[in-house]
Structure formats: structure tokens, C-alpha cells
Amino acid sequence: MMIIEPHIHMLSRTTDDYTAMYNAGIRCVVEPSFWQGVNRRHPGTFFDYFQLSLEFEHTRARRYGVDHWSCISVNPKEADDLPLAMETLAGMAPYLDHPRCVAVGEIGFNRITPNEEIVFQHQLEMAKARALPVLIHTPHDTAQTRKVDGVSRILDILREFAYDPSMIVVDHNTEETMPLTRKTDYWAGLTVYPYSKLNPR
């Protein structure tokens, strides 16, 4: 049986992880764009990252028997710097049109700010223009942010957006947000980690 890993960030992993995944039956992975630990300061650093994901990482994975695909986006964690985000979106088309790009994502909210919403909506439009699937990041619960509020706002935006629900994954749901997402026709994603988000218990 072939297993597909639909959401993994391999740029921060070693080739030992590819070997372990292959041994477990994983033959295909999809890597969404993500925040690398510090905010980028220039559009060019985003573009270098997109190229690395689309070309180098695909080649690296293939050496270990794994087919690697990418989702391209300005991640919500970096969407609050609106001038930088918009300049990056203006140059993102070649990466979205790359044959190894299979979706736009992750997009959505980090702190549920107006700037994040602007960037989210622009990227939804970019996906729709290309008939690409969309992978949506829902915010984490923090002292300042409630995940359920972020999911509610995301679902409101998606209703206004009127894109084929079968093309949209609302990811990182929890027991608090799953009832909201399951009332819609969007795919409801769960994230399993050993010690955070959902875990085996």
C-alpha cells in the first residue's frame, strides 16, 4: 500500500527522515510553504525558498524513493508585513505555475489581523485564477488569539469567496473547531504531533 503524506515540512528535515518514511510505506509527500523561524525581509528570500522547495527538495526526495510536491504561498506567519507580502505576491506567479506546485498554501491566519486577511484573500484569488487547490492554516490558540475565532472568520471569507469546496482543505482543526468545519463542504484536516495539537491520546 502506498501512503501519501499530505502536509510535511521537509526542508527542515534530514535525509534520514526520507529513509524512515520510505520504510514506513510513504511514497509521496506534499510540502506547504512555511515560516522558517525568522521573518524574511525581502521578496527575493521568498523566491529563493520557493525555488528550493520546487526543485532542490524534489530532487533530494527522489533519491530516497519519495515523490515530493509543493504548495506555494506567503505563510500567514509572515503576512502581517503587508508591503513585503504584496510585493512577494506580485512576483509569485512563476512559482505557482511551476509543474511541481500542486496547491496554494498554507494560507489563512496567524493572529487574525486585517493585513493577514488582505493577504489571505489575494492568495485565494490567485488559486482560483489557476484552478489550484487551497491549503488553509488555522491559527493556534494563544493568549491573544482564539483558534475558533480564526476558523469562524476563515469560513465566512470562504463563503463569500465562492470557490469549489472540494478544492479547499481547512487544516489544523481541533475538537473545538471540527464541528464548525464539518458543517461545511470543505475538507477538514487534523494535525497529529507527538506532544502538541492532536496527539495519540
Question: How would you describe each model-predicted region?
Answer:
Residues M1-I157, F161, M167-I168, H172-E176, ...:
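Mid-domain alpha/beta scaffold segments of enzyme catalytic cores
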Residues T184-R201:
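H/E-rich (His + Asp/Glu) clusters that bind or coordinate divalent metals
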